[in-house]
Amino acid sequence: MATIYRNGRFFTGSDKSFAKCIIVQDGLIQYVGDESHPTIEKMKKGNFNEVDMLGRTILPGFIDGHMHLMLLGSSLKQLSLEKCKSLEDIRATIKAYAVTKPSLPRILCRGWMHSMTNGEAFASMIDDLDDRPILIDSKDLHFTWCNSAALQELGVEDKEDPAGGKIHRDENGKTTGLLSETAAQVFAWPHFANVSSMDQKLEAIEEAITAYTAVGCTGMVEMAMDENVWEVLQVLQSRKDLPFRLAAYWLIQPSPNEEKMISQVDRAIELHRKYNLTTSPNCRIAGIKIICDGVVDACTAALQEPYCNGKDPESLWTPDMLRRIVKHADSSDLQCALHAIGDRAIKMAVDTLEAVYKPGKRHRIEHLEMASPTDAKRLGQLGITASIQPVHSDPAILGAWPKLIGNHRASRAFPYNEFHEGGAVLALGSDSPTAPHDPLVNLYTATTRRSARDLENKSVVNEAAILSLATAISAATKGAAYSCFADAYTGSLEVGKTADFVVLDMEWSPGNLLEARVVQTWFEGQKVYAVDC
């Protein structure tokens, strides 16, 4: 039976015109337009349901264009340090939490930033807080700070540094407490998986899905898929229908052994052949993810010019090796998603994708925080999707940037308008759990360049890069769908596409987005979330 959704403001891609009505049948949109159209009159002569949208705004279901599902679910159970300002705050927060959780085998924390501890992270700073292992994930997920008990549990004392990572040590070779980049991914992440039961992992993912549905998301793009998470997803899918679509990118770890890296890509190719748009559109392997550099806050993002403190890190991959791995994936029709934050890493990523360029491949670059004007223009020319996370441009977390990279470079960071004006498709994501998963928070910062974390902070980051509300919403819906080849059936309210949409109480004003409220989430024509109205 068809359902007429009427008396709403249905977003069709422009902030100047909205449809007033849609018709949905068998989970698909059959009509978008005015209520007075002959199609509506004809429909009313037969059997139909009618839903009054009460004048609310209806957007396509949000699609988080860059996120980490298992990590988000796990983080919801971890101690947040995001409100801490100093080492003293961190110590007090952990100590108080530990007292209230005596049965936990280890204390897991998240949200630490280097600026909170003057760039330092030693086990000795937190060893006296508790005898149990304490592991603190950095806000950007590129570092894990451990106490001595955690280092012992991880067994890293005699391990060699993995390619692209570092186990920090003192002058005597003793581990000091910090795991950087791939060292965190190779040692800490698998350990968390190994000490968690399947039921705990399933619970974490289900909690993440529930959290996403409550903020209007009907699709997600997972950017660090591995064997552990994939296994859990397959078990969950076998037990129930899930209210979302997931496109995943297999994380490729750097290695001095090229065969090992090729074998990782081959595993992604194998899974892609089995789980793709045709065979498994709601949970599939879309491509590979390669992390080309680190982050600005830790001075590990690869820049064309050194940091103000003299640090000058290399990219995590050589151009030659990156090109070979990308070419291998591209030849098997895998999309390539390249994490690149610093302008040197961004140039290398663009150069690499240019070398394998063919129209329609939809390769993508993640973050693009320090793109040069020249490389910003190249994205559109080469059909590269600009995968952006406006929540990372929140001025409340960028206080250290002028000191690290200078005012000039800091003032033109996150140049999203240049990507858009250059013709690149924008795909908006949160990078959760490194940032809030709520799309409205993301949209607020994208359209105001002001802080959603600290409303008293009146700073504006690179005001010229502000996106219009319609552009930002399109990036969070249609653009994100396009980025993973899902735009043929979702991402916009168009005839023939699935009825995935979110109903909001909201004013069409960037400055009021934080007051907006998700009222309902619909997936394939079924209501999967609702609040009491």
Which ranges hold each PLM region?
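Acidic (Asp/Glu)-rich catalytic clusters
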Residues: L236-K240, H272-S280, K358, L379-Q381
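Hydrophobic membrane-embedded alpha-helices
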Residues: G165-G173, A371, R378, L382
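Short, Lys/Arg- and Gly-enriched loop/turn segments at beta-strand edges
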Residues: W508-L514
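Ligand-binding beta-strand-loop-alpha-helix segment within the catalytic cores
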Residues: T385
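His/Asp/Glu-enriched, well-ordered alpha-helical/loop segment
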Residues: V326-A337, R344-H363, H367-L368, P373-K377, ...
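Short, charged, surface-exposed secondary-structure boundary motifs
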Residues: C146, P256-K260, Q264, A396-A400, ...
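Divalent metal-binding segments
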Residues: A2-R6, F11-D266, A286, I290-H328, ...
